[in-house]
């Protein structure tokens, strides 16, 4: 209610639809224009809504990692909910049993891990050092932790069993992050 008041939302139905669409896109690259088109408001309105949700710790935008910090400011982030319970409610998930078989299970687990890493960092009085990585070949790692002198890559999976394919993107990113001496481009 406070967020809606801050935004002076005139049509609560559209704002609720926006929240549900965001919950359905957890862990995906955020595209304001796409959401705006789906609910019939301007991209500027969506950006304003996201800004307030971010400032009030309802959502967290995970930026992409680029060595060039200017690119980090212009490329699209991924959106996560700071409260996975809220995300589940927006998705209509009412029990652990339902979650166990829901198509969003993996995304919600990724959301939980990202937000817990973020909270740990913020509770230490530090700014976020979390990113995600995706290259032009669609190699993607869910989380990169920038430790100043090194990067730690984390791939989040909710699967009950290990599959060697889970390592593919991690190995590719590790080649880029930790190249042999003299091979970094």
Regions found by a protein language model. Give the residues of each.
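A cross-kingdom feature that marks ATP-driven nucleic-acid transaction machinery
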Residues: 48-59, 63-185
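Conserved helicase/translocase motor-coupling segment
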Residues: 1-55, 61
